[in-house]
From Swiss-Prot:
Note on how the cofactor is bound: Binds 1 Mg(2+) ion per subunit.
Binding sites annotated in the UniProt record for substrate: N264, G321, I322, V323
Subunit structure: Heterotetramer of two alpha and two beta subunits.
Binding site for ATP: K46, G53, R54, G55, E99, A102, E107
Any single GO CC term annotated in Swiss-Prot or TrEMBL for this entry: cytosol
Name of the protein described by the UniProt record: Succinate--CoA ligase [ADP-forming] subunit beta
Family in the record: Belongs to the succinate/malate CoA ligase beta subunit family.
GO terms of biological process kind: succinyl-CoA metabolic process; tricarboxylic acid cycle
Annotated EC: 6.2.1.5
Molecular function terms from GO: ATP binding; magnesium ion binding; succinate-CoA ligase (ADP-forming) activity; succinate-CoA ligase (GDP-forming) activity
Amino acid sequence: MNLHEYQSKKLFADYGLPVTKGYVCENVEQALSAIEKLSGSQWIAKCQIHAGGRGKAGGVKVVKSAQEVRSFFTKFLGQRLVTVQTNEQGQPIHQIYLEPCAEIQKELYLSAIIDRSSQRIVFMASSEGGMDIEEVAEKTPHLLHRVTIDPLVGAMPYQGRELAFKLGLSGKQIQQFSQIFCQLAKLFVEKDLSLLEINPLVILKNDELFCLDAKVVVDDNALYRHPDLFSMRDLTQEDPREAEAEKWNLNYVALDGNIGCMVNGAGLAMGTMDIIKLHGGRPANFLDVGGGATKERVMEAFKIILTDSAVKAVLVNIFGGIVRCDLIAKGIVSAINEIGVSVPVIVRLEGTNADLGCEILAQSNLNLIAVNSLTEAAEQAVNAAKESE
């Protein structure tokens, strides 16, 4: 689950990290009231969306007067911001964050992620802050420094000092950086985060370190332990299909293709998408109905897939281990009868009660294409999608 910048900074402040006092505003009146409370004669206005690249898209701007604040809010509030990290529709803007401008001497980069290969938390830091870290890693990898956290002892101050030296910090900055490093590690573990990023972490003109930006992603699987974080969830920033799928315990991820996929099991779902790509097709989604799929869940899965107007064909690939293929078949028939599916549906059933499931599909007199192998299913789906365009 992603947090907005202002929510992330609230977390940072709770852990004693250096952040400015800002105000999140939902209308022009709140914004004009906020700048009266903020210090300085110019401020930063930041559109709050769950995506990076806001600055390059115009969603972050220095505003120097009440009129500029009014113009910025009028232009962006209620609109959608398209960045390099969003789709072509962009993300809706319902809130804008206002904070004082900072006098910056230098920009740094600091983040923490879970490294799957080492199964440890890894901190990454660079003297090239304010840039896309992927670009730094590609063009100047020697400027990206890493520290791995031992889960038995946690983050140690000496590790923070080592990073500080590599970043070229000196004097009191080293001690301050080490404190920031240790507190971020504590925050990461205690709040069950999967990603934490400060870009940029700046050195101010007074030589103090400051968290100018904040990005936090919470592990969805741990949200039950953090009702305070779950209450921060902004459903307007999420794909409505993914939110609806979550209600039915369906694992759904929207993609940009035209072949809808409904599969049981994450591994089989990924394999299905791979074989669609292998035959020249483009998956429209990842959808795992799970091992305990029921007729009702299959119906809802169909509804969710077909809310995507880009879908030109649907491939159903079910291996009946725990789940019974006849129940899946009944769900498919019920869904098509209820929704009125107009795109070709290719079905491959294998495993428990597969023959009975195929018989149910055959007796339905619906426009279903039943196949025996995954290769044939992919070929049929790709061809059907091309013919429907």
